Every structure is written in structure tokens, then in C-alpha cells.
Amino acid sequence: MARLLLFPSQACVDPGRHLLLHPPVSRPRAVRSGPPPAAPRRTGVVSLPGRCPPPLCWNHHPFLPCRSSKRGWVVFASENVQEISSHLPRKDERRSGNLLLRFSALPYCTMAWLSTAQLAQSSVGEKLNMVYEVGELFELGIQLSYLLILIGLLGAGTFFVIRQVLVRRELDLSAKELQEQVRSGDASATEYFELGAVMLRRKFYPAAIKYLQQAIDKWDRDEQDLAQVYNALGVSYKRENKLDKAIQQFQKAVELQPGYVTAWNNLGDAYEQQKDLKSALKAFEEVLLFDPNNKVARPRVDDLRPRVSMYKGVPVKSEKR
């Protein structure tokens, strides 16, 4: 059986014979009275509603009409299927073309929208990834800086601890050797002084006072060098809060060596602790005579001068201990 090709104008084509059926446009639609027509047979021709299929004209010209005397059908014979589209109504052609354009443009618009959305999403994702990476790098830098600071602090602390341990060990070894010499009775005044200085650095003040006093008793060298022994003995008394004895030792030290600025500073500090501001100011001024840029005496003089001028003429009792 031949297949049919239907068009919007309700014409049909029989591929077997290349027939084009089209109802006459100029003739009015006839109204038929009587019983309804029988169902058309499958002859490769489709009839219009209310009309019977016309007889086929096989031997006519491909595009010359063949009129039926009974039903008024017009039959066109076509040898080429491509020529059929030229006989379609122009309005139907334009409508079909518009529909095809719309439906064909829809997938392209959808794809363009999807691609734009994907690009926007990818750009946003890239920005978020960049921000996240920058945040990670910043956090990593902070952690590394904290780690370096911690390592530096630990290194500095370790250095000071090791240094203190080494100093303490050296002092212990020195004290041990000096004590052995003192026990043997062969120790000199210098060795007693060294042992007293070691005990002073180890903060064993009573032992330091004992050995320094023995060094003064056995001193047989230059008296100016003895000023250092008196100064160390005064520091030991001062650490024991025995300010009167400390001042006596400092005075002996500056008597033996007038330019001994360390003993003068210690003497001024001891007077200031006793609230004897005038004597303290005098001691610090003596330091500036020998060392005008002394970092210990200069600020103390600047602080004591206004205080002494304010209390001038008012007796200030010193606290004796």
C-alpha cells in the first residue's frame, strides 16, 4: 500500500504515483442531501470532508487539472516531490517557517543561557577559591610567624638558661677550688677576696662577708686595690639591709681610691635608702666630677636636686637600721 504525505492544506501525495490532490479554490462548497457517503477506500488518495474521492487521472500532464464531473475534484500529477512545495499556500509557508524558526531558536537560547549560567557559576567559584586560598596563605603566614617567635623566645630563653648554668657551674668549680685552698691554710688574701666575690655572686651574703673580711685582714698588696674589697664588702652588707655598715665600707673605698665611681654610686644609693637626700646628692655629684656622662649618676642628680631644694632648711631624720 502506498504511503501518504499530508500538508497543511489537506492535500495528499501518493509516493507511488506522485499525485497532488488539492480542492478547487474558486468553487463553492456543495451541500449534499441524502444519505452520507460511504467510507473511502485506501486508494492512495484522501478526500476532503463531505466529498468522495475523485477518479485518478494518471495520463495527464503533471500540473494540468483533471476535473471530475461528479465531485468537482482537481487532480495534479507531479513527477518530482520537491516541486510540491511550490504549490503550498504562502500564508501556510510563512507560518510554518516562523514556527520552525522559533522552535529551532529555542534550543540555542537554552544552551546560551545554560552556558552563561555555567560561566557565571564558574567565575564565582574561582573567586571563592581565590579568596579561600588567600585566607589559607594568610593564616599559614600568621602560624609561621607565631612559630618563629616561639622558636626565638625559646632560643633566647635557652641561651640565658644555659649561660646561667655555665656561670653557676664555673662559680661552683671556682668556689670548690678556693675552699680547698682555704681549708689547707695556704690561701692568700687575693684568694680570700675571690672566694668572697664568688659567694656574693651566688647570693651567699654571710659567707661573702666572712671571706671578704678575712681578705682585708690578710691584705698585703697595694692599698688602692684594697678599695675593691671594701666595695664588695659594702655591697654584701647592703644586700643584708645593714646600711650603716655598708656606708662605712663605701666611705673607706672612696678614701683609698677617690676616682672609684662605682663605690661613689653605691654610697649615694645607700644614703638615698636612708632618706639622707643631701648626702646622696653629694655622692652622685662626685661621680659626675669624674664621669660627667655617667648613666647612673646623671638621672639621680636630676631627680634629687629639686627634692633637696624643696626640703632645704627642714631636718630630715634618717632611718637607721
Curated annotation (Swiss-Prot):
Q: Which domain of life is it from?
A: Eukaryota
Function text: Nuclear genome-encoded factor required for the accumulation of photosystem I (PSI). Functions as a PSI biogenesis factor. Cooperates with PSA3 to promote the stable assembly of PSI in the thylakoid membrane. May target primarily the PsaC subunit.
Q: What happens when the gene is disrupted?
A: Pale green phenotype.
Q: Keywords in UniProt for this one?
A: Chloroplast, Membrane, Plastid, Repeat, Thylakoid, TPR repeat, Transit peptide, Transmembrane, Transmembrane helix
Q: Where do the TPR repeats lie?
A: 189-222, 227-260, 261-294
For this UniProt entry, which segments traverse the membrane? Answer: 98-120, 142-162
Q: What are the BP-aspect GO terms?
A: photosystem I assembly
Q: Which PANTHER family match?
A: LD24721P (PTHR45831:SF2)
How the protein sits in the membrane?
A: Multi-pass membrane protein
Specify whether 4Fe-4S is a keyword of the entry: no
Output the InterPro entries linked to this UniProt entry: SGT (IPR047150), TPR-like_helical_dom_sf (IPR011990), TPR_rpt (IPR019734)
Q: Which Pfam family is one of those matched by this entry?
A: TPR_16
Identify this protein by name: Tetratricopeptide repeat domain-containing protein PYG7, chloroplastic
What is the gene called?
Answer: PYG7
Q: Which GO terms describe its cellular component?
A: chloroplast thylakoid membrane
The transit peptide region is found at 1-29
Q: Which PROSITE patterns match?
A: TPR (PS50005), TPR_REGION (PS50293)
Q: Where in the cell is it found?
A: Plastid, Chloroplast thylakoid membrane
